[in-house]
Amino acid sequence: GLFADAVKKDRIIHVFGTGHSHMIGIELFVRTGGLANINAMLDDSVTTAAGARRGGKIEKLEGLAEIIWEQYQIEEDDIMLIISNSGRNSVPVEMAIKAKAEGLKLIALTSIEHSMNCRSRHKSGKKLYELADLVLDNCVPSGDSLMDFAGVKSGPGSTIAGCLIADSILAETLNKLSAEGVTLPVFGSQNVDGFNNNDLYEKYQSRIKHM
């Protein structure tokens, strides 16, 4: 798999999402039992940290992905995982276009149903799933709601489904690598006495911004 290859080739796995999708990057980043070569691209401008409505407007702007990209050390042959439930907004689409142009393998985690029922907000007319080397469908219905209460939609499923998919990929990656006898670059829990992740920090901190 792409994640396993990244570990064996000493490449970085970059994870990007806007709005609530960025939480899937946090789920994978510097996490107990998680891979140390994962770089969560966390830019306050496109999350809720600097204002929810503000972030919702900014993720539709073209030109921002390039600015965010330049804040990170991203190299050819790295892996890029982009999460967007709708797959339509300009920033994730533009980030996908940039990743492909720079020679990265691109994984998209998205709702195919939602994507098929909306128009792209990027000038290319492309949606995220159309640009990826590998598409992971979270199977969440259009509108990101799993329940109906007298006509009121609720029960958002994209974050839960996305985290489950991401952690399942992690588990399969570790299973594959361990079967091949590869040393696993995995964080231990800082809340268990005797933990020591210093070797992992020293190896990756120069390449991973928020570590």
PLM regions and their residue ranges:
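Active-site phosphate/pyrophosphate-binding segments
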Residues: 9, 34-36, 175-211
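Glycine-rich phosphate/diphosphate-binding loops that line cofactor/substrate pockets in enzymes
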Residues: 1-11, 73-75
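Glycine-rich phosphate-binding loops that contact phosphosugars or nucleotide phosphates
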Residues: 14-170
